[in-house]
Amino acid sequence: MTKTLLILASVYGFVGVGLGAFGAHALRARLPEERLANLELAVRYVFFHIPALLAVAWLHTLIGGELFEEIAGWSFALGVLVFSGSLVLLALTGERRWGAVTPVGGVLLLVGWGALIGAAIFFHSYTRGVVTYPLS
């Protein structure tokens, strides 16, 4: 999972820079302001979640394949794809139906953050090899 998340974070960074530049230069004069705003939001959310993917990859090297960390990694990976991908499609095509898909990606991102919270709460227990009740 570590290698996969590192690759995804790198691909998302590559795509984010490319889309940001494409939007700022090639599309600025061609798209209405609302659609440009959708593209900018998509790029922003890609970049917000690259550090999260890297953090989960780092956690994976420390504690291995624990449930919260696995859920966080895949939720972030899919959430970025669905959330930002639907906004990019909305921006490029103008098809409003893509906007209906965006909340699904948002929920996946929220699940990822919640799972990362769970991984942080249980982190001390995992590192000692015994799961204990957190915050006790």
Predicted regions and their residues:
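Polytopic transmembrane helical bundles with strong interfacial aromatic enrichment
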Residues: 1-136
